[in-house]
Amino acid sequence: MKYKLALQPNKHIKTWKTIAETVHREWGSLSNFIKASEDDFLILKDLVQRKYKKGFPYLSSPKIFNYWSFILGQYGGVQLKNLDQIGIAPDTHITQCSVVLGVISQKEAETLSKEEISDRWRNSLKGSEITPIEMHPPLWFWSRNGFLYKL
């Protein structure tokens, strides 16, 4: 594998085949799937994470689903309603950034749930016109690169 883009190539093939088959069987196309959600993030979330969860392996996890929804709008031209409801996914990198930026304390990083950390970001960004998920890529890369750029 030259670029190692798929860390589990056989599993990823099965995962995306399952997702494609689910979309085709239930809606006929990705466009119809989005239309069935009324272009609403909350309805789309319910379809993927609850009603048809088994048909969306990998994608139904909160972190991946939120980021996929963001990518649909950012690069796919899908204008979803309720984008402000797409929370940041506090993985290790986002949690570390949250501490460095003072969104949470080091102790809170060890005790707060992912949902509580996500809520802190939502509250911190209120009124800024920046959605929490928009913060994910720059924060993730900042932490991933060892906080190379200092504030």
What are these regions (language model features)?
Residues M1-L151:
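HhH-family (HhH-GPD) DNA N-glycosylase catalytic core used in base-excision repair
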